[in-house]
């Protein structure tokens, strides 16, 4: 499975990299699509990760993150596309991990269900 390759306590858990290193992607990129109607204002916000360059233009791919609390400084910089509605206790239990400090794979994702509401 895919791992949570970057986990920062009190901030977020990042996943979606097929290589598990933080530097991989799906082989394509697309522009950031932030909306003023979707904000990083609560625990469990799900957003696209990007390179943080050019306001995310052409740097979104397969990576995403789940916030551990409100992160308003990310508004307008990352596209919010969902929220965790069940199982946030599991998300909060993901162990801290810095890919720059460890080459070992992160925690494997066993199952995630995404639904439209």
Functional labels for PLM-detected ranges:
Residues 1-117:
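Cyclophilin-like peptidyl-prolyl cis-trans isomerases
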């Amino acid at each position: 499975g895919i791992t949570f390759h970057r986990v920062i306590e009190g901030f977020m858990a990042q996943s979606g990299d097929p290589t598990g290193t933080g530097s991989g992607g799906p082989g394509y990129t697309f522009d950031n699509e932030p909306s003023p109607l979707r904000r990083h204002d609560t625990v469990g916000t799900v957003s696209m990760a990007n390179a943080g360059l050019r306001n995310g233009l052409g740097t979104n791919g397969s990576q995403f993150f789940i916030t551990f609390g409100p992160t308003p400084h990310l508004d307008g910089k990352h596209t919010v596309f969902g929220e965790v509605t069940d199982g946030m206790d599991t998300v909060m239990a993901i162990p801290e991990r810095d890919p720059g400090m460890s080459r070992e794979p992160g925690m494997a994702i066993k199952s995630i269900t995404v639904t439209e509401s």
